[in-house]
Design a protein with these regions (language model features):
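A structural signal for short hydrophobic beta-strand segments in well-ordered beta-sheet cores
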Residues: 158-161
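Short, charged, amphipathic alpha-helical segments
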Residues: 298-303, 330-337
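Amphipathic, small/basic residue-rich leader segments at the start of a protein or domain
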Residues: 1-108, 125-128, 132-135, 294-302, ...
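Internal helix-loop-helix
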Residues: 65-136, 178-184, 308, 315, ...
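Glycine-rich beta->alpha junctions and the first turn(s) of the following alpha-helix
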Residues: 20-22, 213-312, 375, 411-416
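A short core secondary-structure module
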Residues: 165-166, 170-218
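Alpha-helix capping/hinge segments and adjacent helical runs
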Residues: 81, 333, 337-416
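A short, Trp-centered hydrophobic/proline-enriched beta-strand micro-motif
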Residues: 136-144, 188
Length: 416
């Protein structure tokens, strides 16, 4: 009767009233009821491969948002459960047992924009945007990087000039993932070029359908075009879409990036085999490629499995830390490095196991192998993550920054 009462609460869209009291088995039973009752799509695809099916992801999120299962730490009124950090970890562990649709198109909204809005957004912004993000109704992209501002993110040149209660934006962004799907973008812009580069920035939300916004997809070597260039020419936005105070854009950006590295909020589910086989599905896929499994091959798989497990634990620890403290720390950088290493290891082993067939498009690991090099760049390069760990964890001296106290306009003219 307890679970039936919970289901009725989900049907009414009120969420789970006792989420922090649920046991692991009760959570597992409830999620199974929801996914089975709703006939949720059970396809699972690798990031960047087959993730264009928006309908399946939207159906899954629309189902889970009624109980706040996908972003449980968010407030109930915004699509969550108001769950504790400990209960969130428990829900995440159970959710990874289920095979769910690829949520790659929705990950920025769920894992980065949502937490930033909860920390820096106004009440009106949270009401307008968070529930739509949690339900999959609204997709967001991240407009940070520029042709001359990648790892040096604070060097952004896209300008925002205030005109009454509006802002006029102009400039270019690049490597904007999910732009072709997105209804909204979170955009870092320069509002005061007379300030040092970190201080003259402000964060905005921009409708991607706005006049003056042009999206040009960038084809990658794995034949995906999930990254884009975005050109902004005289686009006008309301001051109500400014996120945080004027000149505080860098602080908001650091919140976004910290949650990106920690992987907070952007659960994509698991492989569906954890309870039965006690092994992730990529191991089973590799086993299909080889008949007589040599001891050397088994040792490689065992090593990768250990690294993969450590990667997931590190990411979970970083995510838990972010939620419990309200401010993601440098642990997210360690999680990002481990995740990249694990992804590359799995991809390269799958490709080498396939032998000569691994050079063909239909081979297992082909797309992943072509995607792997980009993993060390996207979301902050490996070098940036190591700098963060060196300075904030090991206490090593930071790199000299001659432009820290010089106005951005002077640094751009080469006056330092």
């Amino acid at each position: 009767m307890f679970l039936i009462s919970l289901v009725s609460e989900h049907e009414r869209g009120k969420g789970c009233p006792y989420v922090n009291d649920l046991t692991e088995e009760q959570i597992r039973t409830e999620l199974a009821l929801i996914l089975d009752r709703r006939n949720a799509d059970t396809r699972l695809s690798t990031m960047g491969a087959g993730s264009d099916d928006l309908d399946a992801g939207r159906e899954y999120l629309a189902n889970t948002v009624q109980g706040g299962w996908h972003v449980p730490t968010w407030p109930k009124e915004h699509g969550g459960q108001g769950a504790s950090a400990n209960q969130n970890s428990l829900i995440g562990r159970v959710l990874r047992e289920f095979v769910v649709p690829d949520l790659y198109p929705f990950a920025i909204g769920l894992g980065m924009v949502g937490p930033a809005l909860l920390e820096h957004g106004t009440d009106a912004q949270q009401t307008d945007w968070l529930k739509a993000i949690a339900s999959g109704e609204s997709i967001w992209c991240q407009m940070f990087s520029e042709p001359e501002a990648g790892s040096d993110l604070a060097n952004v040149a896209l300008s925002a000039q205030q005109d009454g209660d509006e802002w006029i934006l102009g400039g270019q962004k690049t490597w904007t993932s999910r732009a072709m799907w997105a209804q909204w973008a979170i955009c870092l812009a320069r509002t005061d070029p007379t300030q040092p580069k970190h201080k003259g920035l402000t964060m905005f939300a921009i409708p991607m359908s706005l006049p003056g916004v042009e999206i040009r997809p960038l084809m990658q070597m794995n034949r995906d075009a999930h990254f884009s260039e975005v050109f902004v020419d005289g686009a006008r936005i309301s001051d109500q879409w400014r996120i945080g105070d004027i000149g505080e854009g860098w602080r908001v950006a650091m919140t976004v990036l910290a949650h990106e590295r920690a992987g907070g909020g952007s659960r994509g589910g698991g492989d569906g085999n954890a309870r039965g086989l006690k092994l992730p599905s990529w191991v089973a896929d590799l086993q299909l490629l080889v008949g007589d499994q040599s001891s050397d091959w088994r040792n490689k798989v065992a090593s990768l499995y250990a690294r993969d497990t450590a990667s997931r634990w590190t990411a979970q620890r970083a995510s838990d830390e972010a939620r419990s403290t309200g401010s993601p720390g440098p642990a997210g950088s360690g999680a990002k490095l481990r995740t990249v290493s694990s992804y590359k290891g799995r991809s390269y082993l799958a490709n080498s196991t396939a032998g000569a067939h691994g050079m063909l498009e239909d081979s297992h690991g082909y797309i992943e192998t072509l995607t792997a090099p980009s993993m060390s760049i996207r979301g902050g390069t490996d070098e940036i993550q190591r700098n963060i760990l060196g300075e904030r964890v090991l206490g090593l001296p930071g790199e000299p920054r001659l432009d820290r106290d010089v106005s951005w306009s002077e640094s751009r003219r080469g006056l330092i």
